[in-house]
Amino acid sequence: MSLVIKNLQRVVPIRRVPLRRKMDLVRSILGVKKFDLGIICVDNKTIQNINRIYRNKNVPTDVLSFSFHENLKAGEFPQPHSPDDYNLGDIFLGVEYILQHCRESEDYCDVLTVTATHGLCHLLGFTHSSKAEWQKMYNQEKLVLEELSRYTGARLQPLSRGLY
């Protein structure tokens, strides 16, 4: 199905083609290419507003995920009942925030890919609210990014690295 990447900000230039290519690979690795996915790139003001409304945190952040399917357990695939259910949800990338926290030695597109992969794991039920949940999420991210690295040659590390 489709991967839609929308850039709703003008602060940071976004190269959508490489991001799309990498996220299509991530979707293949995870086995979710038959599901629609939205990735929306926003600035600090917008991501802060969304974070305030949905998480009661009035600060910008790197990624927010909104799953189409509720109550998925870590690693479960959605069980669509109709064609309209073939949707994973939307990932909002705070691209300005991500750029501000990107190290000089890091490739910005790689960091966007890692962050979007983290968001996609959330859409598949992974969380990091406890050490046990974090370990599952970290392992999943690591597995996916290692496989992606084989295709791209990049050395990608999970976003959730070092949370616990």
Swiss-Prot record:
Q: Name one Pfam family in it.
A: YbeY
- Recorded protein name is Endoribonuclease YbeY
Q: What does this protein do?
A: Single strand-specific metallo-endoribonuclease involved in rRNA maturation.
**Record HAMAP family:** Endoribonucl_YbeY
Any one GO CC term of this protein is: mitochondrion
Signal peptide residues on this chain, from the entry's feature table: none
Q: Provide the GO biological process annotations.
A: rRNA processing
Q: Top EC class per UniProt?
A: hydrolase
Record-linked InterPro entries: MetalPrtase_cat_dom_sf_prd (IPR023091), YbeY (IPR002036), YbeY_CS (IPR020549)
Q: Which PANTHER family match?
A: ENDORIBONUCLEASE YBEY, CHLOROPLASTIC (PTHR46986:SF1)
**Enzyme Commission number(s) of this protein:** 3.1.-.-
NCBIfam families from the xrefs? rRNA maturation RNase YbeY (TIGR00043)
Gene name, per UniProt, is Ybey
Gene Ontology MF, one: metalloendopeptidase activity
Protein family according to the UniProt entry: Belongs to the endoribonuclease YbeY family.
- Identify the residues that bind Zn(2+): 118, 122, 128
Query: What binding details are noted for the cofactor?
Result: Binds 1 zinc ion.
Which cofactors must be present for this protein to function?
Zn(2+)
Q: Which UniProt keywords apply?
A: Endonuclease, Hydrolase, Metal-binding, Nuclease, Zinc
Tagged with keyword Disulfide bond:
no
